[in-house]
């Protein structure tokens, strides 16, 4: 027999990397000759096999994804509770009295901020820090009953942030707060939002449980007319006893996040289900038992529990459900790519030494060090300060942009780097999960940037527990619901409770701020924000656009994007605060109103800059369906004009550092170049 002394690493679910096998009879025996590939050829063949597996997986999911619509939860009485606020009665604030007091303030609001999460808070704080504005100049509005945005709504068991707390939790330097762990719990993050509000006098400046529905520019008065509804507080914050309201504001800032409204897929016969049904973003501790502070879900001890979806939220929830449920069934379409998190308590000695040694501005420098690694800057800093799974994933720059993104071979280079990382992720699943079948199902076959990477130390091992079952629905999906459960793969599962971990109603394309917030925005001459986004977007720096004067917004379209969303929001806030403060300084008198908007030429020039860099995101094509790529939307089906309009909606393709440098250089000139200022004397 012919034998080779070479050994080759195994690769599950991949073809054997052998070039030729020959067999012949010699002297009554069978002699086999195996011709193996050389190392370079082996790597190429392996890469081709992985790419083929990626494409096959994508095709399976595109066929299975189908056309499942979403239920409009505010219009279906059976699902109204998905839109309610289960925490409204526990905030310790007289929300109705505070709303009435703020509404009774005479005259127009100077600055209205829509959203009281970290985005809204950062806009408010950076405005106050200019010295031109005070907290009394600011009114904040949010549909929640407290500060925190997505961290207000999400209180499910196991909730944590997968971005390091020292860079994610804003204004640590200003508030003097030390996070308890490297990765903070949702509870701690929400408390920090409240701390910021208290520190800057904003706690009494918010109209909670209030929804803005319309913004209309009054050209004669040079103000925004704001119309909406004040929601009920009783009955767990249901949308009862709504009262309409109207106010006017000189300036409006839209800081609504993208993760507020739960996504409820309209599965066939979902209305027939008689058991308990809720969404992870509206966790029902009354049913499960436990609380936010102590999530011992003893109410599930005799229950068969299903969770649909295995994204970032489910990765954190599944280990907790597995611990307390009699039976847990996890319905999975796309497996998460789960790396280690390695959380640890903050060492006070290290904290004191680190912050003192770094001095003023330490948090911003740490954030930017993190950005350099995740955007794959060249050259990289000599020290990786955060040094975690994110900073060891340069391929994620395909999704958020980076300075090398326009290199012709960049996507190919990142595919090679990412393939090694994903191979380790796949090996990790097989090393931890004992069942070969479950391990195969939990193995991700897609580039790492196609889904949000996850980091958790207990998720995969939860599938080793005898009370946990994994159901693969990527081929056929969920067929329909029944009175007692649901049907998948022609099997009916009887369930006491179904938990939807199906994400949020994020539009499938880079939607306008008005679409994300469900607000109708109409500017000068009836120009709508929706039309601006649909018909060839042009902005100045991604924060303002012509014919919507005195209106500012946060987002990624024509602005910088990064893993650490809070850093990007802070750059938006710092920039807008500078513009507003400098515009106010130029008023001919204190009583004069200022109207701010970009010139047509400046916003079109900025759009062209964005277009020139949009090719940096070309690696997103070919991903498995998900909200990051419009659930598999095929750009080739668009007309050339539609493709250009879509490219105008992209983020700044050179990465967040390039974007910030551009803004800082623009501010350093001090001339508000590209902005048209007019002044209006109000008598």
UniProtKB/Swiss-Prot annotation:
Domain of life: Eukaryota
An example Gene Ontology biological process: dehydroaustinol biosynthetic process
Protein residues bound to FAD: 150-153, 162-163, 168
Chief location bin: membrane
Disruption of the gene: reported phenotype: Impairs the synthesis of austinol and dehydroaustinol.
Keywords: FAD, Flavoprotein, Glycoprotein, Membrane, Monooxygenase, NADP, Oxidoreductase, Transmembrane, Transmembrane helix
Gene Ontology MF: a single term: monooxygenase activity
Cofactor(s) needed by this chain: FAD
Segments crossing the lipid bilayer: 111-131
Protein's name according to its UniProt entry: FAD-binding monooxygenase ausC
Organism: Emericella nidulans (strain FGSC A4 / ATCC 38163 / CBS 112.46 / NRRL 194 / M139)
Gene: ausC
């Amino acid at each position: 027999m012919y034998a080779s002394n070479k050994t080759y690493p195994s690769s599950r679910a991949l073809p054997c990397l052998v070039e030729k096998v020959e067999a012949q009879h010699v002297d009554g025996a069978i002699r086999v000759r195996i011709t193996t590939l050389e190392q370079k050829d082996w790597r190429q063949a392996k890469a081709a096999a992985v790419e083929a597996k990626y494409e096959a997986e994508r095709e399976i999911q595109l066929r299975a994804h189908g056309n499942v619509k979403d239920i409009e939860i505010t219009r279906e009485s059976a699902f109204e509770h998905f839109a309610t606020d289960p925490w409204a009665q526990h905030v310790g604030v007289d929300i109705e009295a505070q709303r009435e007091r703020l509404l009774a303030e005479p005259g127009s609001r100077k600055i209205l901020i829509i959203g009281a999460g970290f985005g809204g808070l950062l806009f408010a704080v950076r405005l106050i820090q200019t010295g031109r504005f005070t907290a009394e100049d600011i009114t904040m509005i949010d549909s929640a009953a407290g500060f925190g945005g997505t961290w207000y709504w999400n209180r499910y068991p196991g909730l944590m942030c997968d971005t390091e707390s020292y860079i994610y939790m804003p204004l640590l330097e200003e508030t003097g707060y030390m996070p308890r762990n490297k990765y903070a719990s949702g509870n701690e993050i929400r408390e920090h939002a409240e701390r910021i509000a208290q520190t800057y006098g904003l706690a009494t400046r918010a109209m909670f449980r209030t929804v803005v529905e319309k913004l209309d520019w009054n050209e004669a008065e040079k103000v925004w007319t704001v119309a909406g509804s004040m929601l009920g507080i009783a009955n767990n914050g249901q949308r009862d006893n709504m009262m309409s309201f109207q106010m006017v504001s000189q300036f409006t800032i839209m800081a609504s996040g993208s993760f507020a409204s739960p996504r409820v897929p309209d599965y066939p016969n979902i209305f027939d289900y008689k058991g308990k049904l809720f969404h992870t973003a509206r966790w029902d501790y009354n049913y499960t038992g436990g609380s936010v502070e102590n999530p011992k879900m003893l109410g599930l001890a005799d229950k068969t529990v299903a969770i649909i979806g295995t994204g970032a939220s489910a990765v954190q929830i599944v280990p907790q459900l597995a611990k307390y449920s009699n039976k847990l069934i996890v319905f999975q379409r796309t497996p998460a790519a789960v790396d280690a998190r390695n959380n640890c308590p903050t060492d006070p000695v290290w904290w004191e030494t680190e912050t003192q040694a770094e001095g003023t501005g330490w948090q911003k420098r740490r954030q930017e060090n993190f950005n350099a690694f995740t955007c794959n800057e060249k050259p990289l800093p000599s020290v990786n300060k955060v040094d975690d799974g994110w900073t060891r994933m340069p391929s994620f720059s395909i999704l958020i942009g980076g300075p090398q993104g326009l290199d012709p071979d960049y996507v190919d280079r990142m595919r090679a780097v990412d393939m090694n990382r994903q191979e380790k992720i796949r090996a990790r699943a097989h090393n931890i999960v004992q069942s070969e079948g479950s391990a195969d199902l939990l193995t991700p076959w897609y580039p790492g940037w196609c889904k949000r990477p996850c980091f958790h130390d207990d998720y995969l091992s939860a599938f080793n527990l005898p009370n946990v079952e994994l159901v693969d629905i990527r081929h056929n999906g969920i067929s329909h619901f029944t009175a007692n459960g649901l049907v998948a793969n022609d099997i009916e599962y009887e369930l006491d409770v179904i938990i939807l971990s199906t994400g949020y109603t994020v539009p499938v394309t880079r939607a306008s701020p008005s679409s994300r917030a469900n607000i109708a925005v109409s500017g000068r001459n009836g120009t709508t924000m929706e039309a601006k986004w649909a018909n060839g977007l042009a902005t100045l720096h991604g924060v303002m656009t012509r014919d919507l004067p005195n209106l500012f917004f946060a987002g990624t379209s024509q602005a910088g994007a990064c893993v650490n969303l809070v850093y990007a929001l802070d750059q938006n806030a710092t920039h807008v605060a500078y513009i507003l403060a400098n515009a106010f300084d130029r008023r001919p008198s204190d009583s004069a109103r200022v109207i701010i908007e970009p010139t047509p030429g400046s916003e079109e020039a900025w759009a062209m800059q964005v277009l020139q860099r949009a090719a940096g995101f070309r690696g997103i094509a070919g991903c498995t369906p998900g909200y990051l790529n419009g659930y598999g939307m095929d750009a080739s089906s668009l007309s050339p004009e539609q493709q250009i309009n879509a490219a105008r909606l992209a983020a700044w393709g050179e990465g967040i550092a390039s974007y910030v440098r551009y803004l800082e250089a623009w501010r350093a000139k001090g001339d508000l170049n590209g902005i048209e200022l007019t002044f209006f004397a109000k008598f």
